Each structure stands twice: as structure tokens, then as C-alpha cells.
Amino acid sequence: MPQLEFAWWIVNFSLIWASVLIVISLLLNSFPPNSAGQSSSSLTLNKTTTNWQWL
């Protein structure tokens, strides 16, 4: 069984963790923040009736 080369292990370890952190930060920043005063869409539906509102 070949010996593990420590330098390549450190390089791969740091590259993988840097990639994971970049992907997580991109995913978290891709969603717009929801402010309390604004609704996420300008479309409002009347939910007091049982009829479907086709858009």
C-alpha cells in the first residue's frame, strides 16, 4: 500500500474545503433577503372563496 503524500493531502483538503465554502456562500447569497414590510410578490390572491382564481 503506497504511503500518503502529506503535501498533496493538504493541497486537496484545502481545495475541497475552499470549494465547499464558496458554493455555500454563493447559494446563501443567491436568495434575495425578505424584508418584513414587503411581500415577495406583487400578486395577491383572495383566499376567502373556494373558487379557483385562474391567472
Swiss-Prot record:
Cellular component GO terms, alphabetical: mitochondrial membrane; proton-transporting ATP synthase complex
TM annotation in the entry: 8-28
Principal location listed in the UniProt entry: mitochondrion
Single GO term (MF): proton transmembrane transporter activity
Coiled-coil regions listed in the entry: none
Subcellular location: Mitochondrion membrane
Cited Pfam families: ATP-synt_8
Compositional bias per record (Low complexity), positions renumbered to this chain: 39-55
The entry's keywords: ATP synthesis, CF(0), Hydrogen ion transport, Ion transport, Membrane, Mitochondrion, Transmembrane, Transmembrane helix, Transport
Family the entry assigns: Belongs to the ATPase protein 8 family.
Subunit-level organization: F-type ATPases have 2 components, CF(1) - the catalytic core - and CF(0) - the membrane proton channel.
Function (record text): Mitochondrial membrane ATP synthase (F(1)F(0) ATP synthase or Complex V) produces ATP from ADP in the presence of a proton gradient across the membrane which is generated by electron transport complexes of the respiratory chain. F-type ATPases consist of two structural domains, F(1) - containing the extramembraneous catalytic core and F(0) - containing the membrane proton channel, linked together by a central stalk and a peripheral stalk. During catalysis, ATP synthesis in the catalytic domain of F(1) is coupled via a rotary mechanism of the central stalk subunits to proton translocation.
Name listed for the protein in its UniProt record: ATP synthase protein 8
